[in-house]
């Protein structure tokens, strides 16, 4: 967090990754380097899958997923909506996740079957189910088909609810859901694992419910393409919007 705070507001050079909208900065690289240096000392036997450096296979059943700066575009533009995301996976099941928002000094944390916290205090999803009052976040990866994105957003706009948001920092969206600030998140195909795996566990441990895009309840795992909401009722409503033939 200190590295990101140090560079926030500065003009940084960009290195393009997959598309013009997908890039990294000196802040991404240095943040990841610092995190990895700590992990390799504290948990040297674990595998590591980090956003910039890729995969380090130590033959362990545990893998640490590292997103050193989720919301790079916001960061570069001087928008204080970004976070650091770290999760621990055991045999493809997420068992712990932490997301840190350095500007607000917020640490969201969860362990499987132990609940979720914000700065050490328990948090829970809200109980809003009135479709006119729900806020929906929609996250799609850089490789998600544009026509698919356009269709879903158009369907959401035509539906009657409070608001649709895309904060450009998917990890933090799960924190908003977990702390009762929003009601639902749609995560589409192509979203990177660093952007959702820790947040998904935090939301679920705060009481959120999950459903895959085919309408089936889905346990916490590393797969993308799902709906997670404050209730099963909200999930079913969102599912009916993005799958109109299922209404």
Each language-model region and where it sits:
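N-terminal subdomain of lithium-sensitive/metallo-dependent phosphomonoesterases centered on the IMPase/IPPase/PAP
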Residues: 1-69, 247
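Residue-level signal for inorganic ion chemistry
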Residues: 4, 28, 39, 72, ...
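A short, compositionally biased
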Residues: 10, 82, 110-114, 204, ...
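Short loop/edge segments at beta-strand edges and connector loops
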Residues: 50-52, 120, 168
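DPxDG-like acidic metal-binding loop motif
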Residues: 58-117
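An extended, acidic
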Residues: 125-247
């Amino acid at each position: 967090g200190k590295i990101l705070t140090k560079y926030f507001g500065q003009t940084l050079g960009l290195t393009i990754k997959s598309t013009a909208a997908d890039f990294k900065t000196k802040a991404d690289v240095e943040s990841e380097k610092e995190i990895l240096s700590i992990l390799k000392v504290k948990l040297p036997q674990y595998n590591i899958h980090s956003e910039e450096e890729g995969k380090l296979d130590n033959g362990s059943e545990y893998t640490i997923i590292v997103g050193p700066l989720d919301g790079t575009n916001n960061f570069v533009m001087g928008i204080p909506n970004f976070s650091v995301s770290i999760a621990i996976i055991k045999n493809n099941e997420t068992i712990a996740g932490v997301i840190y928002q350095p500007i607000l000094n917020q640490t969201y944390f969860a362990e499987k079957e132990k609940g979720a916290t914000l700065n050490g205090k328990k948090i829970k999803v809200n109980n809003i189910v009135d479709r006119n009052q729900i806020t929906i976040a929609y996250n799609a990866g850089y490789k998600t088909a544009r026509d698919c994105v356009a269709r879903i957003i158009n369907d959401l706009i035509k539906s009657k609810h409070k608001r649709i948001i895309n904060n450009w920092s998917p990890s933090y969206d799960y924190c908003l859901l977990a702390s009762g600030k929003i009601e639902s998140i749609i995560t589409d195909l192509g979203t990177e694992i660093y952007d959702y795996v820790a947040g998904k566990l935090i939301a679920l441990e705060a009481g959120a419910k999950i459903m895959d895009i085919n309408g089936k309840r889905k346990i916490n795992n590393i797969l993308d393409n799902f709906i997670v909401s404050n209730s099963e009722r909200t999930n079913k409503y969102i599912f009916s919007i993005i799958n109109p033939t299922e209404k």
